[in-house]
Amino acid sequence: APLMKLAVKNKGAEKIALVTDSMRGAGMPEGKSILGSREKGQEVIIEGGVAKMPDRQSFAGSVATADRLVRNMYQLGERSIEEAVYMMSLTPATIMGIQEQKGRIAKGYDADIVVFNADIQIQQVFINGQQY
């Protein structure tokens, strides 16, 4: 948490993107999962929110979901919810050069919206205005 706070303090929310490279086990119950393809992938174990190799001697990949990153930045990084969402939406869109269609709720933008509750638990998802 101290590193998160320092990074945002020095760079600002507009220069920090929250990004996840989570593997297939993200958001799934603890237990066995697969890293890579089903046919040629490596079996891993998800425990305590971490993916580990079966011998539990090394990490096997990230299981951090986007909502978890927003929650961590808000709670542990002590940033406002607006800043945390900005770092997950508009900052990455700007980095990718698609800030004219993604990253905001505004006329002319893609209606990609994630609705969450006060605990930052996902309640609804809309992609191009279509609820899923």
Language-model regions, residue ranges each:
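His/Asp/Glu-enriched, well-ordered alpha-helical/loop segment
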Residues: 3, 7-20, 25-109, 113-115
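Short, Lys/Arg- and Gly-enriched loop/turn segments at beta-strand edges
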Residues: 119-126
